[in-house]
A protein has these predicted regions:
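Beta-lactam-recognizing serine transpeptidase/beta-lactamase-like catalytic domain environment
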Residues: 81-93, 106, 133-134, 139-190, ...
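Short, well-structured beta-strand/strand-turn elements
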Residues: 13-15, 124, 277
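Solvent-exposed, polar/charged alpha-helical surfaces in well-ordered, non-transmembrane soluble domains
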Residues: 4-5, 26, 30-34, 60, ...
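Small/polar-residue-rich segments within soluble enzyme cores
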Residues: 1-99
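Short regulatory "switch" loops immediately downstream of catalytic or recognition motifs
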Residues: 38-42, 116-129, 159-160, 228-231
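Soluble periplasmic/extracytoplasmic beta-strand elements of cell-envelope proteins
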Residues: 2, 14-16, 31-35, 103-105, ...
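Structural signal for hydrophobic packing residues in well-ordered secondary-structure cores
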Residues: 70, 118, 122, 249, ...
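Conserved, well-ordered alpha-helix/loop/beta-strand core segments that scaffold catalytic motifs
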Residues: 2, 87-139
Length: 289
């Protein structure tokens, strides 16, 4: 501070004030926390009443979404000086105000476990440790409290170090800055069976005790097969809806789809939120995720 106060009298020297954001846990929850960077021209034009043109601002993640709460207010300290730079008096004309704290539902320990497990499994799949090798390079994990909907962990791989964002971003071709947990749209897979089961029960296509005989190869359409048939060349046999969900029986739900029709299935899938955004407090959520 004293150097800056005497900046004009010190030839060849310039003092620059630069805010620093420290990420004490490295890459942990990098896609959730996001990164910061210098305010750009467009951002400054819409915020110049409260920002300087050399400010650092949230660019992604929580730091972007809650920027207005996280940003504090700079203080102003005025001093009187003699011609040789000696301070004769000083007083604060404006106190600095710290930004607010933002408390997340993320459990740091669970987040660490999720990230490590995700990375390990992606590497194992690529190496063929679970059977056939696959060109697997990326993935995502979300852990939620089923009673409240709170997100306890959200991992996306590959991840990144927020402190090194600016030097890495322009050279990145891995997509590691994309939060795949919310920005990727993926087929729902067998989780879709819950929507079909609900529709079948609500619309009277079956009762809780109705049983369907899975023979392995479905007789209609293009004759799709149950996963069990692919592995064991037979079907699950007679199953009710609870058992069909337990064993993830494709044949059972092919039959439910045939009985219900596409419109009813689409209606119930929509009620479950499929094809819609969740409204999570992060930017970049893809519709239908």
């Amino acid at each position: 501070v004293q150097l800056k106060e005497q900046n004009a009298s010190l030839a060849g020297m310039n003092v620059i004030t630069e805010p620093i954001v420290s990420y004490t846990s490295g890459n942990l929850a990098s896609h959730v926390l996001g990164y910061v960077g210098p305010i750009d021209e467009q951002e400054y034009e819409t915020r110049k009443d409260t920002y300087r043109n050399d400010d650092i601002i949230g660019k992604s993640g929580i730091q972007y979404v809650f920027e207005k709460y996280l940003k504090g207010t700079d203080g102003v300290k005025q001093v009187d000086m003699t011609v040789d730079g000696a301070i004769t008096s000083e007083y604060i004309s404006e106190e600095a105000v710290s930004g607010s704290d933002v408390v997340l539902t993320i459990d740091a320990n669970l987040q660490k476990v999720a990230e490590e497990a995700l990375k390990e499994n992606i590497e194992n799949i690529a190496a063929g440790k679970y059977g056939e090798k696959h060109d697997t390079k990326a993935g995502a994990v979300v852990v939620m409290n089923v009673h409240t909907g709170e997100v306890l962990a959200m991992a996306s791989y590959p991840d990144y170090n927020p402190e090194r964002y600016s030097e890495e971003y322009s050279n990145d071709d891995t997509g590691k800055y994309t939060n795949r947990a919310i920005s990727g749209a993926y087929p729902p897979g067998s989780t879709f069976k819950m929507a079909v089961a609900t529709a079948a029960l609500q619309e009277g296509a079956i009762t809780p005790t109705s049983r369907i005989n899975d023979t392995g190869v479905y007789p209609y359409g293009h004759h799709p097969v149950c996963w069990y048939y692919t592995s064991y060349r037979s079907g699950h046999g007679y199953l009710n809806v609870t058992q069909a969900l337990k064993y993830s029986c494709n044949y059972f739900f092919y039959e439910m789809g045939y009985r219900l029709g596409i419109d009813k299935i689409t209606d119930y899938a929509s009620r479950y939120g499929l094809g819609k955004r969740t409204g999570i407090e992060l930017e970049g959520e893809a519709q239908g995720n």
